[in-house]
C-alpha cells in the first residue's frame, strides 16, 4: 500500500503527533511509499508564510525532503478532479477544491489518502484511512 498524506495529517506530523509518527514509521518499515500532494505543500507553506514561522517552515522543508511531492502536471488528474467536483455538486455534497484535487491525484495514482477530514469520504472510488482512528 502506498499513501498520500492530506494537509491535516502533515500538519499533525509536523507537530510531532505520536500516532501519526508511529504509523509513518510502520509504513516505512513495510517499505510502503508515502507522498505529499503539491496542494498540501501549498496549503502548509502559505500558512507558515502568513504567520512568519521560519522554524516551522524549516521543519516542513525537511519533511518534504523525506516524502516526494506529486505535482498536478498530468491533465488526467485535472480531468478526474473535474469529474469528482461535478459528481459531488450533482449529489449536493460538494467539498473544497483542494480536497477534490488531492482525491483525484490519489485515485489516478492508486494511493490511499490519509486524512482526518470526513468530507473526503464523499468521493466515490477513493481509498481513505484516518490514522488517528487506527
Model segments located where?
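Nucleotide phosphate-binding site architecture
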Residues: 10-11, 21, 42-45, 121, ...
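Generic structural signal for small/hydrophobic residues in well-ordered secondary structure
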Residues: 6-7, 44, 81, 106, ...
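Active-site neighborhoods of divalent-metal-dependent phosphate/nucleic-acid chemistry enzymes
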Residues: 70-114
Amino acid at each position: 500500500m502506498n499513501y498520500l498524506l492530506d494537509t491535516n495529517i502533515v500538519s499533525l506530523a509536523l507537530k510531532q503527533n505520536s500516532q501519526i509518527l508511529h504509523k509513518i514509521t510502520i509504513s516505512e518499515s513495510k517499505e510502503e511509499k508515502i507522498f505529499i500532494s503539491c496542494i498540501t505543500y501549498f496549503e502548509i507553506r502559505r500558512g507558515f508564510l502568513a504567520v512568519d514561522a521560519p522554524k516551522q517552515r524549516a521543519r516542513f522543508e525537511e519533511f518534504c525532503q523525506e516524502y516526494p511531492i506529486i505535482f498536478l502536471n498530468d491533465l488526467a488528474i485535472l480531468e478526474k478532479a473535474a469529474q469528482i467536483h461535478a459528481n459531488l455538486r450533482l449529489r449536493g455534497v460538494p467539498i473544497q477544491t483542494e480536497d477534490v484535487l488531492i482525491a483525484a491525484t490519489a485515485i489516478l495514482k492508486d494511493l490511499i489518502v490519509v486524512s482526518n477530514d470526513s468530507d473526503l469520504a464523499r468521493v466515490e472510488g477513493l481509498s481513505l484511512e484516518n490514522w488517528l482512528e487506527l
